[in-house]
Amino acid sequence: MYKDFYASLKPLEGEIPYAEEERLAASGAPLLSWYRKNRRLLPWRENPEPYSVWISEIMLQQTRVEAVKPYFARFMEALPDITSLAQVDEERLLKLWEGLGYYSRARNLKKAAVCLMEDYGGQMPASRDEILKLPGIGSYTAGAVASIAYDLPAPALDGNVVRVLTRLFADPQDSTKPALRKKYERLLEAELVRRTEERESYLSAGDDAGK
C-alpha cells in the first residue's frame, strides 16, 4: 500500500527541488492524495480529542496497532476522560491494561491525569512544552497530542515518519543518529508552520506511509 505513495513521487522527480525544505513541501500533495485513498481506519482517529490521542499514543508504544484496538475501546469505555482516569484505583487500572505489558505506562497515565487535575483544571494543555512536563510523555507523544488534537505546528517524529523522510530525501545516513532526527524534526516543524490546514491528516499520512 505505502509503495503507491512512493510511486506517486516518481513523475515529480524532475520538478521537486533539491532543497530539503522545498522537497518536503512539494511532496505534501501526493502524500495527502495517497492518504485519502489508503488511510487506515483507526478508532482513535474518529474523534481526535486530546485525551483519546494521548491514550492511544501511549498504548501504541511497543505495541502493534491491531493489538491496541480492543484495549483502546475497553479503556475509553471504562475511563472516558481525565477525571475518571485520575480517580481510578490502581488495581482496576492495571486490570484494564492487563495483556498490553509495560505496566509503567498505565501507572504514568494515572500520575499524569492527577497532575492535569491539580495543575491544569482537568484539561490537557494546548502547548507541546507543557504536555512534555507530564509523567510518561516524551517528545513524540507531546508532538502528536499538540498537532493532532490542537492543530499546532508541533512535530511528531517516530520511526515511520523517519522512514518516509529518509526515502524522500534519499538520505544514506543512519536514521537512528540523534543529529539526523533533530534535523528531520526541524524540517517537519517548519513544514507544519507553513501548512495551515490538514496538519492532523498530514502527520497521520506520514505515519501510515512509513509502515
What is each of the regions a protein language model found here?
Residues 8-11, 16-21, 30, 34-211:
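Catalytic cores of DNA base-excision repair glycosylases
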Residues 24:
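Active-site neighborhood of HAD-like aspartate-dependent phosphohydrolases
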